[in-house]
């Protein structure tokens, strides 16, 4: 079985990619599509997220431009150019003062989170496209609708926004991550530090390069903006953002402009930038070093661009189990009483009942319950031990019985509790066991006679290094030996009779 993303519930935050040790999920790459554009000679412009300033290694920012153009792109322009357009729209909203609260809509994961899980807050969302979409539309206006626009950045949610949201379809043709481009440079033998310092294809976007860090949107909006009456707040990290959204849902805050980022630290710490392992402080300082806070973007003359976006209620109403259905799931998890509900949190859910509800809704598997899995494993292990016709026990270096199966207990004539307090030498000879524990060499299928148990057996003893003990298995062959003995006696009697005749 494999976990599958429930697209209608997903906010594309990338947490599953970051935390999964098995790398079971990967980012769907557009690399071949982009290479196809370049190989066919299609005019292709790259929209470069300003987070490159804190993620990529270079001596001069222009070296990144040259390295990208060597791959075949016709032009490299900063996404911050689109951010400048978004800043102007935010300033208009603030100046008008018509919205009770304004939530920035630059982060597509935050947009998904609100539309799917906080639909009552949709009216507070700034009705403006993201900087990436604004930039894509600007580039297509400049060069015509046939130009291909490729976005390069650290965010995987941009992919879902560009190709999965019909409201902004067509603005961006492909998405690449920094990791993908670095591999591409390596394949082509391009070393950024050896490249020329080339200028971007766009005018200076000024302070709008700060969008990728926490508070960057607010700083951009305040620079050159007119006075307004909104308090400015910024929050980063999904937990902090959800706490703030909960407060807004309760109506506890009014007259605020809220800049929210799902990624703690902002876009510079996006899921496709984690491999660099830069601290939030270092990433922020690297970017701030390249940006002049007080400079507005150089104005670009262009035809009017559609920057409006209508956000919607996309709330998913999950089926809720009845108390009886919930009880059935809990029983399947091995939770028969309230005392069985350990609420250990190992499955990722706060309580066993929350986990059971998720199982009912198809979001989780019963096997994800760690205590249940351990109990199942122990149950299966005990079943195997008890079902085997052989006598099995584990003995430590002191000859203390550590484990014993039912068949052995029957032969010893004692209970399991009593057996675990006894020594094996009280019942049988232990020379072979001592030898294996001393030499750490196994004995396999040795024929012996356990006189005290009235058993003829084939003995197998294996040393278990992890617990410094011996696994002892006796295969009872008494019946076979007696049958063989009877057959031999019959054979000898037949020979004896024949000789007498």
Feature-to-residue mapping (PLM):
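Iron-sulfur cluster-binding cysteine motifs and their immediate structural context
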Residues: 1-11, 15-31, 274-276, 346-360, ...
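Short metal-coordination and nucleic-acid-contact micro-motifs, chiefly zinc-binding Cys/His arrays
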Residues: 6, 12-16, 256-259, 337-340, ...
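Iron-sulfur-associated redox domains of electron-transfer enzymes in respiratory
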Residues: 28-317, 321-330, 350-357
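Intrinsic disorder at enzyme termini
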Residues: 364-373
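Sensory modules in modular signal-transduction proteins
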Residues: 376-411
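Terminal output helix/cap of sensory domains in signal transduction proteins
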Residues: 417-453
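A short beta-strand signature within small-molecule sensing/ligand-binding domains used
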Residues: 452-460
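Sensory coupling linkers of modular signal transduction proteins
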Residues: 462-501
